[in-house]
């Protein structure tokens, strides 16, 4: 277990991010942030996720008494389209049809914010994901599980959509929702863990 030098708060209610950070042996608390996740005009995918990650960390920092805050945001980018979480079944079906048989990228931005020093480390990590060709009935069956609705791009690589993925290039944990290697390095650089 990595020893935290001060309390660390994950500014996310995502069970996947909680599981990933726990797997690194880091002690932390969870307090969900509440920010507008809309895309700003002219914003690149990396700028978008880093801005939201930082906003989530700073939002939670204003409301709680910890020292170090981790914010994160994940999107899928396919043929220039930025995909967040689907609005409904039709949107999930549209996203999965678009991802079917072609590569796309998962982009996660994170921020490690030190409230005491008002310092922040941010970064965005890209992972290329290759989907197999999906049949319409596969897409409908997956949507019927309810799994797509709280996930960028309407799928969870660590869950029911694992069979859809032919290969990935880059960080697996990034696709799940938190680029663990980079986040742990940032926590060390910030002095949050030993």
Curated annotation (Swiss-Prot):
Its cofactor is a divalent metal cation. One of its GO terms (cellular component) is cytoplasm. GO terms for biological process: nucleotide metabolic process. GO terms for molecular function: dTTP diphosphatase activity; UTP diphosphatase activity. The record marks 16, 74, 158 as: Important for substrate specificity. It catalyses: dTTP + H2O = dTMP + diphosphate + H(+); UTP + H2O = UMP + diphosphate + H(+). Its EC number is 3.6.1.9. It is found in: Cytoplasm. Keywords: Cytoplasm, Hydrolase, Nucleotide metabolism. The active site is at 73 (proton acceptor). Its main location: cytoplasm. Pfam families: Maf. It comes from the Bacteria. NCBIfam families: maf, PRK14368.1. Nucleoside triphosphate pyrophosphatase that hydrolyzes dTTP and UTP. May have a dual role in cell division arrest and in preventing the incorporation of modified nucleotides into cellular nucleic acids. Belongs to the Maf family. YhdE subfamily. This is dTTP/UTP pyrophosphatase. The lineage of its organism: Bacteria, Pseudomonadati, Thermodesulfobacteriota, Desulfuromonadia, Geobacterales.
């Amino acid at each position: 277990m990595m020893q935290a030098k001060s309390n660390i708060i994950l500014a996310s209610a995502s069970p996947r991010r909680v599981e990933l950070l726990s797997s690194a042996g880091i002690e932390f608390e969870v307090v969900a942030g509440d920010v507008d996740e809309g895309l700003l005009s002219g914003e690149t995918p990396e700028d978008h996720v880093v801005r939201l990650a930082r906003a989530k960390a700073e939002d939670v920092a204003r409301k709680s008494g910890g020292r170090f805050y981790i914010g994160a945001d994940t999107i899928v980018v396919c043929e220039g389209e930025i995909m967040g979480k689907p609005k409904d079944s039709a949107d999930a079906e549209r996203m999965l049809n678009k991802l079917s048989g072609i590569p796309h990228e998962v982009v996660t931005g994170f921020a490690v914010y030190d409230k005491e020093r008002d310092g922040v480390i941010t970064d965005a990590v890209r992972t290329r994901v290759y989907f197999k060709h999906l049949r319409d009935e596969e897409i409908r069956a997956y949507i019927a599980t309810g799994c797509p609705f709280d996930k960028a791009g309407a799928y969870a690589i660590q869950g029911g959509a694992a069979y859809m993925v032919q290969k990935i290039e880059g960080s697996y944990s990034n696709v799940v929702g938190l680029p663990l290697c980079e986040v742990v390095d940032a926590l060390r650089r910030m002095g949050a863990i030993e």
